[in-house]
Amino acid sequence: QFDPGNLYSVPYCWGTVGILYNKTMVDEPVDSWEILWESKYRDSILMQDSVRDSFGVALKYLGHSLNSTNIKELTDAQQLLITQKPLVQAYVIDQVRDKMISGEAALGVIYSGEAIYTQRENPDLEYVIPKEGSNVWIDSWVIPKNAPHQENAEASINFLCRPDIALMNFEYITYSTPNEAARELIQDEDIRDSHIAFPDEAELANCETFTYLGSQVDATYNDLWKKVKSS
């Protein structure tokens, strides 16, 4: 969307945001954001300490776009997050990995690459993209037009795009590679066909990419988020 035809950017890695849950602590099917408002999981829910990620969860649960600029939709999402707050153990970012691995929480909102890492450490963990949809994101490389060493930058990107290097990078960072040739080199069939690393079109059907909404809307989101955190 930001670069039609990939004329100016090269995709580096991609992924989704979803729910990581401990199968020994959650005894029901997990397919909806709704479970993050279940009172029986009080003090065992981890939310992202991020305004767009947390509002994205609430907005999608309510059936809205995670890029909504509608003030009523945003205030409804804010109220939903305020209602949820007594159930939340903590608002975290990277800490969600360690807390879920050690069994300190039953449910956590997490990035898919982090989910793959946590599963390696704790096989009782499972990841799902809720049916209402979520955020699908992509990190890309670009070279500024005034780059003083353009040829070096191009060489670096070309190196990272080599299938063998892209494979090594994927195995290290555990975030999905968009390099199809690198994916074919993955020897572990479970990883190569993983719905976490490589979800199919049906799983992504209701997902969206965050877009920049402008400074004024960003300020509105931030004000609403501050009230959630201080409630």
Annotate each PLM feature.
Residues 1-104:
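Extracytoplasmic ligand-binding site segments that recognize negatively charged/polar headgroups
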Residues 1-6, 117-129, 190-195:
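Ligand-binding "clamshell"
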Residues 74-83, 89, 121-147, 191:
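Periplasmic-binding protein-like
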Residues 18-25, 60-63, 137-149, 168:
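A bilobed periplasmic-binding-protein/Venus flytrap-type ligand-binding module shared by bacterial periplasmic
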Residues 144-205:
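Mature extracytoplasmic/periplasmic domains
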Residues 101-102, 107-124:
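A ligand-binding cleft/hinge motif common to bilobed small-molecule-binding domains
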Residues 201-231:
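Conserved C-terminal helix/tail region of periplasmic/extracytoplasmic solute-binding proteins
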Residues 33, 96-97, 115, 153, ...:
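Short, hydrophobic alpha-helical packing/hinge segments within bilobed ligand-binding/sensory domains
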